[in-house]
Amino acid sequence: MILFQSNTTTSYAYTNIQPKYAMQLEITILIVIGILILSVILYFIFCRQIPNVHRNSKRRPIYSPMISRPHMALNEI
């Protein structure tokens, strides 16, 4: 006589709940990563000046080569 009969279909009842939470967590993580990437892109577009964009501007360079123009080095100080 069998006193306890295990039903194999009831063991899967709790596993159907897990993928829903995993899917929601995955969607949330993807949204957060997307917002971070978008904010970095917008920061570089609107807030930070990318170097060498204005090639024809008449700004003073960051450094002055002193070997090629030694007479100009004293005038720029």
Swiss-Prot record:
Name the UniProt key words of this record, in alphabetical order: Early protein, Glycoprotein, Host membrane, Host nucleus, Membrane, Transmembrane, Transmembrane helix
Q: Where in the cell is it found?
A: Host nucleus membrane
Membrane topology according to the record: Single-pass membrane protein
One GO CC annotation: host cell nuclear membrane
Provide the residues annotated with a glycan attachment (glycosylation): 7
Residue spans crossing the bilayer: 27-47
The entry sums up its family as follows:
Belongs to the adenoviridae E3A-1 family.
The name on file for this protein is Early E3 9.0 kDa glycoprotein
